[in-house]
C-alpha cells in the first residue's frame, strides 16, 4: 500500500518524516569557536577586511522531499543526497519504516559511510513509539518528531495533545533523545480566542519537548516566524527551511518551491532562529515546478551553502 502523506494528515493522524542539524561559521579565514560551537571571526576587524555575516556549515534534508524516488532505491538516492553537500538527514515513516528496509544499525552504518548523520525522523507516534525511541537512541539520533495532529476542534483537544507530547518526551528522555512536534498552519490560526501553538508550547515540558518550526507553515496562515522565535526562545530547536511561491494565493498550502525563488526572507528568519536556540536546519520541498525532486534538492543545497546572514 502506498504511503499517502496528505491523506494521512487530513485524517488527523500522526505520521512520519525526517531531520537535520546545524553548524554556523563566519566567513573570514581567521576564526575561533565560542562555547556554543559557533565559529566567530577574530583578527582584522576592519569593515573592508572582514565579512561578519554567518553561514551554515551543516544542514540537512527531510527525505520526504524525495518521496517518489527514495522508496525505489534508498541507498542510491541517499548517496546522491550526500553528494549535494547535505551532512544530515531527517527521515519519515514510509511503508519500509524510518530506516528504509534496513535495520537501524545498518542504516547508521550506511550514513557513516556517506559522511552523513541521521539526526531525526518524523514517525507515527501512536504506534510502537517505545520501540522506535529505543532504536533511535541506540544509534544516536537526536529527535523523534510528531509530523501532524490535524486541526483540533477545541482548546481542550490541544491540551490533551500537549499531555501526550509530555509522555512521548519522557519516553524519549529515557532513551537518550528528545521529542518534538512539527507544526502545520492550523496551529497558527486562532481558536476560541487562543492560538493553538501557544497552547501546545505553554502546556509542554521544556525539559523534554521541543518544537520544529516549519517556516513555510508559519508564513502560510499569515503568522510571523521571527515573532514566534523571539516569543519562545530555545523551544524551536529544529526548523524546516521551505520556501513559498511568490504568486501563491493567501493560505494556499500546495505552494513550496526551490529555495531562494520564493517569498520567505530566510537570511532574516534564520539569523533570529540561530540567536534564539535553533540547532538543526532541515530543507524540505514538496512541489517542483519546472524541475524534478532530485534536481530541486540539489538546487536547495547550493542555496544553503551560499546563504549568509
Each model region followed by its residue ranges:
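Acidic (Asp/Glu)-rich catalytic clusters
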Residues: 50-54, 78-83, 99-117, 130-140, ...
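Conserved, mostly hydrophobic/aromatic
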Residues: 61, 81, 111, 136, ...
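Short, low-complexity, disordered segments immediately C-terminal to signal peptides
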Residues: 27-48
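Acidic-and-aromatic substrate-binding clefts and catalytic sites of carbohydrate-active enzymes
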Residues: 66-72, 92-103, 122-131, 151-159, ...
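N-terminal export signals
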Residues: 1, 7-27
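Active-site acidic/histidine proton-transfer and metal-coordination neighborhood
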Residues: 18-20, 51, 117-211, 294
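Hydrophobic faces of well-ordered beta-strands that scaffold small-molecule active sites
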Residues: 57-62, 89-91, 118-121, 144-146, ...
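Acidic/histidine-rich catalytic cores of soluble enzymes
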Residues: 88, 176-263
Amino acid at each position: 500500500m502506498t504511503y499517502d502523506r496528505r491523506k494521512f494528515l487530513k485524517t488527523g493522524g500522526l505520521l512520519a518524516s525526517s531531520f537535520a542539524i546545524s553548524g554556523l561559521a563566519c566567513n573570514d579565514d581567521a576564526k575561533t569557536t565560542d562555547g556554543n560551537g559557533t565559529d566567530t571571526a577574530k583578527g582584522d576587524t576592519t569593515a573592508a577586511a572582514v565579512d561578519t555575516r554567518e553561514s551554515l556549515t551543516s544542514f540537512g534534508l527531510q527525505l520526504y522531499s524525495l518521496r517518489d524516488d527514495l522508496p525505489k532505491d534508498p541507498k542510491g538516492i541517499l548517496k546522491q543526497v550526500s553528494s549535494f553537500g547535505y551532512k544530515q538527514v531527517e527521515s519519515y515513516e514510509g511503508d519500509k519504516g524510518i530506516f528504509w528496509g534496513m535495520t537501524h544499525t545498518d542504516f547508521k552504518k550506511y550514513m557513516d559511510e556517506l559522511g552523513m548523520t541521521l539526526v531525526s525522523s518524523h514517525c507515527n507516534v501512536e504506534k510502537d513509539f517505545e520501540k522506535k525511541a529505543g532504536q533511535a537512541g541506540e544509534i544516536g539520533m537526536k529527535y523523534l518528531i510528531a509530523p501532524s495532529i490535524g486541526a483540533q476542534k477545541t482548546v481542550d483537544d490541544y491540551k490533551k495533545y500537549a499531555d501526550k507530547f509530555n509522555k512521548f518526551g519522557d519516553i524519549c528522555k529515557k532513551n537518550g533523545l528528545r521529542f518534538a512536534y512539527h507544526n502545520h498552519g492550523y496551529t497558527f490560526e486562532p481558536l476560541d480566542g487562543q492560538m493553538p501553538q501557544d497552547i501546545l508550547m505553554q502546556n509542554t515540558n521544556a525539559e523534554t519537548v521541543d518544537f520544529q518550526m516549519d517556516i513555510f507553515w508559519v508564513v502560510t496562515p499569515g503568522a510571523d516566524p521571527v515573532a514566534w522565535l523571539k516569543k519562545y526562545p530555545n523551544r524551536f530547536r529544529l526548523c524546516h527551511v521551505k520556501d513559498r511561491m511568490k504568486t501563491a494565493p493567501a493560505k494556499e498550502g500546495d505552494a513550496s518551491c526551490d529555495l531562494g525563488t520564493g517569498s520567505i526572507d530566510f537570511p532574516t528568519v534564520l539569523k533570529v532562529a540561530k540567536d534564539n536556540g535553533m540547532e538543526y536546519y532541515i530543507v524540505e520541498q514538496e512541489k517542483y515546478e519546472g524541475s524534478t525532486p532530485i534536481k530541486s534538492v540539489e538546487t536547495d543545497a547550493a542555496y544553503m551553502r551560499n546563504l549568509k546572514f
